[in-house]
From Swiss-Prot:
Cellular component annotations (GO), alphabetically ordered: cytoplasm; nucleus
Composition bias, Acidic residues: 18-38
Gene3D superfamilies (UniProt xref): Transcription factor, SBP-box domain (4.10.1100.10)
Protein task: Trans-acting factor that binds specifically to the consensus nucleotide sequence 5'-TNCGTACAA-3' of AP1 promoter. Binds specifically to the 5'-GTAC-3' core sequence. Promotes both vegetative phase change and flowering. Regulates phase-specific patterns of leaf epidermal differentiation and flowering time, but does not seem to affect leaf shape.
GO MF annotation list: DNA binding; DNA-binding transcription factor activity; zinc ion binding
Pfam families, per the entry: SBP
Region (Sufficient and necessary for DNA binding): 45-129
Protein name in UniProt: Squamosa promoter-binding-like protein 3
Disruption outcome: Plants flower early and have a significantly reduced number of juvenile, adult and cauline leaves, with a shorter petiole and a more acute leaf base in the first two leaves.
Residues that coordinate or bind Zn(2+) 1: C54, C59, C76, H79
C-alpha cells in the first residue's frame, strides 16, 4: 500500500469547491433574510406598544412619555401603584410580581404582590435559609 494518493483522489475538483461555495452563499442569504424579517417584526411590535393606553377605565394618562415597563404592561405609573382601580367593572390591583391586575381578594391588606406569588417567594426564602 502506498501512502501517496493520486492528484484526482487527494484534491477536490474546482467544480466541487465552487458548488460548495455557492451553497454556503445561498445559506447565508437565507439566514440574512430571516434575520431581517425577525427584526422587522420586532420593530413593528415596538411601534404599536409605544402608543399604548392605560387599561384602567377612564384613564387619560399620556403613555408616550411613560417608562418602557409601563408601556409594555399598558398601565400608567399612577395606576400601577394605586391601592385599587376599576377594570371591566371590577375592583382590582396591579401585582408587581405578575405584572397583571388581580381582584382585590387575591392580595393581603395593602400589599402590591398577590398571595400566590408571595407564597412562592417566601418558600424560596425558607429553602435558602435551611441550606
Amino acid at each position: 500500500m502506498s501512502m501517496r494518493r493520486s492528484k484526482a483522489e487527494g484534491k477536490r475538483s474546482l467544480r466541487e469547491l465552487s458548488e460548495e461555495e455557492e451553497e454556503e452563499e445561498e445559506t447565508e442569504d437565507e439566514d440574512t433574510f430571516e434575520e431581517e424579517e425577525a427584526l422587522e417584526k420586532k420593530q413593528k411590535g415596538k411601534a404599536t406598544s409605544s402608543s399604548g393606553v392605560c387599561q384602567v377605565e377612564s384613564c387619560t394618562a399620556d403613555m408616550s412619555k411613560a417608562k418602557q415597563y409601563h408601556k409594555r404592561h399598558k398601565v400608567c405609573q399612577f395606576h400601577a401603584k394605586a391601592p385599587h382601580v376599576r377594570i371591566s367593572g371590577l375592583h382590582q390591583r396591579f401585582c408587581q410580581q405578575c405584572s397583571r391586575f388581580h381582584a382585590l381578594s387575591e392580595f393581603d391588606e395593602a400589599k402590591r404582590s398577590c398571595r400566590r406569588r408571595l407564597a412562592g417567594h417566601n418558600e424560596r426564602r425558607r429553602k435558602s435559609t435551611t441550606d
